[in-house]
Design a protein with these regions (language model features):
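Short, low-complexity N-terminal leaders and the immediately following helix N-cap/first helix
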Residues: 1-74, 147
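Short, glycine/charged-enriched hinge/interface segments at domain edges or termini
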Residues: 11, 64-165
Length: 165
């Protein structure tokens, strides 16, 4: 004789379907505070209310410039720009980059008004004893800039249904 259990009272397929259908496998959604949301599952899609990041930012250390000021610049014939300030990550820029100007900028810092590109520090030389920087490469608008909304744009899906928080 075997130690194996035998199940003689099996449910019919109809009974099995009825038993499964009676389970509450699709609970009603409920709203909870953010403090209580950890480990919960989203019932529906969540769209971003705002751009992330909410500003254009530098994707590397260097100088915020107007790309048009670097047109034709190269190692043999650099563009020379006036240094008008510094922008640090986490700080609001207090400088405007005008024609022929640049601002030193840290990775992740907000791009100052007037600038539309960032040149990496390795492609520059500070002019000794002057507030001027030589740019040894040409840039296009948007070079080394992460635009506002690059991670998630306002109105785009931030989280989908069934996402665990």
């Amino acid at each position: 004789m075997s130690d194996r259990k035998e199940f003689r009272d099996l449910a019919t397929p109809a009974e099995a379907h009825e038993a499964i259908a009676s389970l509450n496998l699709d609970p009603e959604p409920e709203t909870v505070s953010l403090d209580d949301a950890r480990g919960r599952i989203l019932a529906e899609r969540v769209d971003a209310d705002l751009d992330v990041p909410g500003f254009d930012r530098a994707s590397m250390d260097g100088y915020a410039v107007r790309a048009s000021d670097t047109f034709g610049a190269d190692e043999a014939d650099p563009a020379t720009l006036e240094l008008v300030g510094t922008v640090h990550a986490g700080a609001e820029p207090d400088v405007f980059v005008g024609d022929g100007e640049c601002a030193e900028i840290s990775t992740g810092a907000v791009l100052p008004d007037g600038a539309d590109a960032v040149v990496m520090v390795e492609k520059t030389d500070e002019v000794p004893d002057e507030e001027r920087v030589e740019i040894r490469t040409s840039l296009a608008p948007g070079d080394a800039v992460m635009p506002a909304g690059a991670d998630i744009a306002a109105g785009q899906r931030a989280f989908g249904p069934d996402t665990e928080l």
